[in-house]
Amino acid sequence: MGKFKKLGIILTSTAFSVGVLSPMAQASANVKDSPERIEIQVASTETKVTKSTLIKKLRELFPEKFNFLTDNDFYTGRGHYYNDDKTIRYDLSFQKTVNGKDVYGSITFMGDDLDLESFYYQPANVADALYPAKYSKDDAQKIAQDFLKKFPNTANYKLQENDFDYGFNYTRPLSEPITYSFSYAPTHNGVTLSNHTISIGVLANGEVVQVYRNSNVSKKATFDGVEQKKSEADVLAQVRDNFAVELRYYLDYNYPSDKREVKLVYMPTSSFYGVHALTGQWQTANGFVAQAPSVKGVEKLASEQLDPRKPGMTVEEVEEFAKSFLKVDPDKAKLQIEMVDERENENGETLYSVSYMYMYENGGSGASFEINKATGEITQYYDVSRDFVQSDSKAEKITKDAALAKAIDYLKEWAPSYIHNYAKPLEDYGYDNYGNQYGFSFPRVVNGIPVVGDEIYVSVGTDGSLRGLNINQQKIDNWPSVSKAVSADKAKETFSDALKLKLQYTKQDKEDSNHYDLVYAPSYEGSIYNQIDALTGKWVSSADDSNNKPQISHPTAAEELNYLLAQNVLEVKDPASFNADTAITKGEALKIILKSLTYGYYGYGNEEETYQSFNNIDPKHPLYGIVEQAVRMGVLQPADEFAVDATLTRQELAEWFIRVLRLESAAKHNDIYKLNFADAGSIDPAYAGYVALASAMGLIDAQQNNFNATEKVSYADLAVSTLRLARAIHENNTGRNYFY
């Protein structure tokens, strides 16, 4: 596609494993990823790809699907590539209002052939994708399989068993459409290739709405043969003999609340990823080794806190520092400081964000770096100058040990007050062949335990230069007590009993490597990245045996009850013996309703501010968050007490539902409603408007023309009515502010 010019640079954090299908947290400390993927834009004048070309490509993939769009409805951006992948991408997007509803889409094509890399589509009408769904998962799988055929050379792609959405803990509001996700991976000799997937999301109305393609397999690829592989039993014994577990704090990201939650867990050792199926060598971050890697001990970077670099920096001082810090040979480029801005991070700290550009012949590159205002220390930096300053290819490259020493020196120079909380890398270094640089991850240490999800990342060029620095220290007030952890021996035994091996092909991270090694990769209780809760001794994630789970039996509401059970809305210890006709308490009913309509987080934006709407529901009460969320939604009104253990009546449920729909203003005018029920006289006048609306909207059915206002609501009743409420919310678009 010809030569390209770099015009700008955008720092973006990227979830590599699942793309657009679901935002997942980092699965494990033993996944070798850079903390940030750098998107570099190229000049539009240097590419022959036009908007019309991209639109034509889209219409070829989806014939007639987007006929309601004109070419003027589409938008394009400049082409871009990544620091670790020079293939140029081209973005196409659209947004339009159709019959009063927003329609949105974004598409990315890549390479000379404009292969589809990602696709996301939000259609106007998704009513058929709500419960009860028009298409089953099996139906959707057939649709996904047919769409897969649109990609070239995918005949050998096989559907993958769903791995856990690790660390991704929320319930989907039932007012949102059902999306079935399928992941396909290429195979060779019947063996799956790791890190190569095509993920396809299909709405329950049959529309393909999400696609993500994670890297292509080169036509030059070579593969180990499977004929001489070692037996699985021998390798399993080898792994068990060298197996170890490690105690870790794990920061689990809660997406709806935008907060971190800390767990104390046992994890398998991160010193190896698998065993070569032919040689028996151990797979590490940087290739295969003959001896089993040893587990490293914690070695702090500093025994006590060092003085901050320059406390209380002013804007003027930051600008002058930037001119010096970012200085390059003026014959190579001219530095322009565009802006020094202030922002507050999630810890409440003020950061200076310095935006700058290097202007050089025929183009320029730009980025921003950040400085902590209170300490004057760099918290985020990426060396853009490497894009136009060529290093001496004949110069001797420093070793990994020398690079590590350089990285520590840079931290002492540019972020000294942080490093007493961090330790030397516990994992092997990473080497980036594209950028000719070493990458190091320095874990935070609390109570002598390394923290997964809070690391300092430093990259050092083979010439010894600082290529990147990233600090994102999390503010966590409460860390689980290590003294309450189950023994490491018990955790090791649990891991060992659950250990299984998966045969797969993996490619080493080398720029010129097209060879795939045959590797046995360990998995635990069905997941490569599983963990054991150190406080309970139980798996954080359990193997999905949903097809074998006991089902709830009921003559009229079995489907609704089991759907809520599958969605983790309804919690039942023994579904097979559960009596769904049991009257439900107000507390339990409120919990089910809110879990059905929200993402499952019931906290305040500012956790230091606590509210108590009822005297008997204090912050320590198990339903405190749910009750307070219901108050914020207007479902409940503050009062002296909330009768959490009292059974819920049908007229009370009607009021809650109408308040959820924000129709209480209309319902309050009870004198305008005529109730045609045979038992209308038994309905409390205060509830008359709510009952009338709930009945008219089909949320709560009458029973032989009797509303039975004071009768108790059963679990079965609530299941049926809650799913009807979810559909009403979707149709009336009244739920958007509930999804915290």
Predicted regions located by residue number:
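Sec-dependent N-terminal signal peptides of Gram-positive bacterial secreted proteins and lipoproteins
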Residues: 2-29
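Exposed beta-strand-loop-beta-strand "reactive/processing" segments of non-cytosolic proteins
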Residues: 61-112, 159-204, 249-281, 328-374, ...
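Feature responds to low-complexity, polar/acidic, surface-exposed segments characteristic
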Residues: 17-27, 541-558, 571-586, 594-624, ...
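Sec-exported extracytoplasmic/periplasmic mature domains
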Residues: 63, 145, 149-153, 323, ...
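Second-shell loop/turn segments in exported
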Residues: 40-47, 127-135, 224, 304-312, ...
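Short, non-transmembrane alpha-helical segments in secretory-pathway proteins
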Residues: 40-76, 133-172, 222-255, 302-341, ...
